[in-house]
């Protein structure tokens, strides 16, 4: 039974979808005015793994990730760069999508943009005014938070304790400084759209309510985002959407933890801002994904050079196990009689697989799930060290385990995809044989060139006095 931690109730709950075997999921996308950073990467990789696991468990997932392509930050950046706001937003939408592809994050089903949903947003605001939850002023339209009785439930904030101006813009036109903007009256030189409330543009929070309702309906299963969005953004979304429909809006609220850099919160002011573009030059996508799953998605994670080296070494160990299985399959036996070593590895595979699913069913606990992966790796290594002619069936079961792990965590994909490419391996074998010939002729310069060329193709070769030259895939 799958359980997920719901920020709204602050406890783990049994996961029940509105429609059988269908998950409607909305994850807040970026405000596209700058490069994608490590915090973005952590959030979207985390929800990618959640989505992959749900799909692995037989659910059809309809995922929506929005783009906030008009906002104060975008307008400010456009002014600084002397560019049109649309040019800025389109530039960084491309950066985001490219970075997500680099991180092997599966594309969302829908990427709605705010500027393409102005009519839906206006209609949403009109209904809130009609129902008495919003009011017009000279500088826009505001949601009256006192009218919504459950305001603050998600973030556990008491309305009376809110300090005016704390993450909520102040305005003399508001009835209450805790009210938030649904529509902002246009200022000179800013992008604007016509509406019944005058020329202007949407506030930040209303966009997600309008777009999620269009694509997922008035009620859906999962709403996700970074922990920093729980207030005011998600709190305001709940108020708007529930006031609009009169229904409970979202069943499960999931939030990812912060990314720290050397023990400090990542920020531009501290000079420790790490972009996906920069870090991808140093570490492969699989190392980054493996780094993110070292901590539970709700917990903070600390990015340090030491932690990344530790992650890289552990991932290499797993890849070595997978490669050793591939090599050992060549000398395995289909009809081998099992002895205690086979029974021991079989039990490890069976128990570890069960433990993996139990961990993932407990709010997608990747930390505990990884323990199962290392248990299998240790078991396989021990088995291969004790057995000269291993069981083919057992080795294939072990490979199948790693393939399942890879599909869910977004790892090993190139290995399993390419390992079936016999033409490539035949070519590599030919190059290794050619290298052996030139080594016999003592042409070590050419031998080294072939070795380096194979490394560039993703293969590491080892000269073993007993077994001759063997090759291994380099996947990270």
Curated annotation (Swiss-Prot):
Catalytic activity: tRNA(Cys) + L-cysteine + ATP = L-cysteinyl-tRNA(Cys) + AMP + diphosphate
EC top class named in words: ligase
Gene Ontology molecular function: any one: zinc ion binding
Family: Belongs to the class-I aminoacyl-tRNA synthetase family.
Cofactor binding, note field: Binds 1 zinc ion per subunit.
UniProt short sequence motif 'HIGH' region, positions renumbered to this chain: 30-40
Subcellular location per the Swiss-Prot or TrEMBL entry: Cytoplasm
Protein name, UniProt field: Cysteine--tRNA ligase
Cofactor(s) needed: Zn(2+)
Pfam families, alphabetized: DALR_2 (PF09190), tRNA-synt_1e (PF01406)
Encoding gene per record: cysS
Cellular component annotations (GO), alphabetically ordered: cytoplasm
EC number: 6.1.1.16
NCBIfam families reported for this sequence: cysS
Example GO biological process: cysteinyl-tRNA aminoacylation
CDD domains assigned to the protein according to its UniProt record, in alphabetical order: CysRS_core
PANTHER family in the record: CYSTEINE--TRNA LIGASE, CYTOPLASMIC (PTHR10890:SF3), CYSTEINYL-TRNA SYNTHETASE (PTHR10890)
Broad class of where this protein is predominantly found: cytoplasm
Keyword Ligase tagged: yes
Classification via Gene3D superfamilies: Cysteine-tRNA ligase, C-terminal anti-codon recognition domain (1.20.120.1910), HUPs (3.40.50.620)
Keyword Aminoacyl-tRNA synthetase: yes
Residues annotated to bind Zn(2+): 28, 208, 233, 237
Extent of motif 'KMSKS' region: 265-269
Binding site for ATP: 268
Keywords, ordered alphabetically: Aminoacyl-tRNA synthetase, ATP-binding, Cytoplasm, Ligase, Metal-binding, Nucleotide-binding, Protein biosynthesis, Zinc
């Amino acid at each position: 039974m799958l359980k997920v931690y719901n920020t709204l109730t602050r406890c783990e709950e049994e996961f029940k979808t509105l429609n059988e075997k269908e998950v409607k999921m909305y994850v807040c996308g970026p405000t596209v005015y700058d490069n994608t950073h490590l915090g973005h990467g952590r959030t979207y990789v985390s929800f990618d793994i959640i989505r992959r696991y749900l799909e692995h468990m037989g659910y059809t997932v309809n995922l929506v990730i929005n783009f906030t392509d008009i906002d104060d930050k975008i307008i400010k950046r456009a002014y600084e760069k002397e560019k049109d706001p649309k040019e800025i937003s389109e530039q960084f939408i491309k950066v985001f999508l490219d970075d997500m592809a680099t991180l092997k994050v599966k594309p969302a089903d829908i990427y709605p943009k705010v500027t393409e949903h102005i009519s839906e947003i206006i209609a949403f605001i009109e209904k809130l005014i009609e129902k008495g939850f919003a009011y017009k002023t000279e500088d826009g339209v505001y949601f009256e938070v006192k009218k919504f009785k459950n305001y603050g439930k998600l973030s556990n904030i008491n309305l009376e304790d809110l300090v005016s101006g704390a993450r909520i813009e102040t305005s003399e036109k508001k009835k209450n400084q805790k009210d938030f903007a649904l529509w902002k009256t246009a200022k000179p030189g800013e992008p604007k759209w016509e509406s019944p409330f005058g020329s202007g543009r949407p506030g930040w929070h209303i966009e997600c309510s309008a777009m999620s309702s269009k694509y997922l309906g008035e009620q859906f299963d999962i709403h996700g985002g970074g922990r920093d969005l729980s207030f005011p953004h998600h709190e305001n979304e709940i108020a708007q959407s529930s006031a609009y429909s009169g229904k409970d809006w979202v069943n499960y609220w999931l939030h990812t933890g912060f990314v720290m850099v050397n023990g400090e919160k990542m920020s531009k002011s501290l000079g420790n801002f790490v972009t996906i573009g920069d870090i991808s030059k140093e570490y492969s996508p699989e190392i980054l994904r493996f780094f993110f799953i070292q901590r539970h998605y709700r917990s903070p994670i600390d990015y340090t050079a030491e932690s990344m080296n530790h992650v890289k070494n552990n991932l290499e160990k797993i890849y070595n196990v997978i490669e050793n299985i591939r090599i050992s399959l060549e000398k395995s036996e289909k009809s081998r009689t099992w002895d205690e070593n086979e029974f021991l590895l079989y039990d490890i595979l069976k128990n570890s697989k069960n433990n993996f699913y139990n961990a993932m069913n407990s709010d997608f606990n990747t930390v505990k799930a990884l323990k199962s992966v290392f248990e299998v790796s240790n078991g396989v290594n021990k088995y291969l060290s004790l057995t000269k002619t291993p069981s083919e069936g057992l080795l294939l079961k072990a490979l199948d385990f790693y393939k399942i792990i890879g599909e869910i965590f977004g790892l090993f994909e190139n290995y399993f995809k390419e390992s079936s490419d016999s033409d490539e391996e035949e070519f590599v074998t030919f190059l290794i044989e050619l290298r052996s010939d030139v080594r016999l002729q003592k042409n070590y310069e050419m031998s080294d060139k072939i070795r380096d060329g194979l490394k560039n193709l993703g293969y590491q070769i080892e000269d073993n006095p007993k077994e001759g030259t063997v090759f291994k895939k380099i996947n990270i």
